[in-house]
Amino acid sequence: MNDIRISVIGLGYVGLPLACLFANKYPVIGFDINKDRVSKLMSGVDSTLEISEEALKSVIRTNEKDTIKNNGLYCKSDLDKIKKCNYYIITVPTPVDINNRPDLSPLIKASQIIAAVISKGDYVIFESTVYPGATEENCIPVIENISKLKLNIDFFVGYSPERINPGDKNHTVEKIKKVTSGSNVESAINIDNLYKSVIIAGTHLAPSIKVAEAAKVIENCQRDINIAFVNELAKIFHLMNIDTHDVLEAAGSKWNFLPFKPGLVGGHCIGVDPFYLAQKAQEFGYHPEIILTGRRLNDSMGGYVANQIIKLMIKKGNTIKSQNVLILGFTFKENCPDIRNTKVIDIYNELVDFGTKVHVYDPWANPNDIKHVYGIDPISTLDGLKKYKAIILAVGHDEFKNIDLNIIKDNDCIVYDVKAFFEKNIVDERL
């Protein structure tokens, strides 16, 4: 493990924590095409809030030469700066298009970038979630064609799927076991040893790249399907006038009952990755029923929640048109500023279609990002001057634990709790 110089391509929710971890032991050059992002990181500011200012500044090096000679992190958007590295780790996003088909363009672009800078003997490791076969069928040919180097002769490839949990300060990257793999036996061992040197939870060396790819994608498919199951239960038990969370608590008294809760499934992983496996399955002539059914059910929950809210308002004798409605939380999960693929937007849009005046409050999300991506101007404070006929707890941010709903409730206000976050006795209904 001598003379290792690492470049992490993509410095977002996945890449930055990984780069910082490696920077404690190795020279690391972080690369991102977003120049503003790079500039802020070099000044010690992480807008994703995954890395504290103190932790970031402890590894950031302002002099590139110091980084190459010693451990530390130097961030750039200049390709020439990463040519001196010999391990390239790709952590770019893998989204879907408007038709929910896999969009590999960020991954292909990253492969092209790497192909322009790698030398003989270098390693390329992919962490982005993909369908089984993507690394070998889509990425490696790009690198070979551009670089004119040959796999397992001139360069080596590995796949080690990311397991970052944004917003979770307990299960950080070094505390989560890492699956590793390589394009041949020697490269697999070297890649496994690289991760093993910084991951205190240890590693699991998979027998092939495809196995590692498949392992990652089914992790998220499994979670998506399990949430879809309890979301369906929530719909059924609502019709029976039974509280779903009371049922889950009772069932959870058995040791082997899996603890999943109903809710919105958004973000860049769980709500996206099942489409990757489904697409690949269809290429082999198999139509995956459970995977796609789970996706459809989970994608329906925003509209379902909005309709339940409207029904509750009508039951209390409220008119719907032009009534003030407040949504607490807009990010795709709690205690995280990430608004990518948030399903709270489905609640918002449905309520707007009903004619209500919907206000969004989220202390974690960047208001400029919400405006830019979704065209919504969130409110900046809950001052009690505006009263609401309906309040929806959509995201369980810690900041909402001590909120006094009475200050912002109008007469005959209904409170709907998507997350079973508040005490049961202060809400009208929970999912």
Q: Where in the sequence are the language-model features?
A:
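Structural/interface elements that position substrates and couple domains in central-metabolism enzymes
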Residues: 1-431
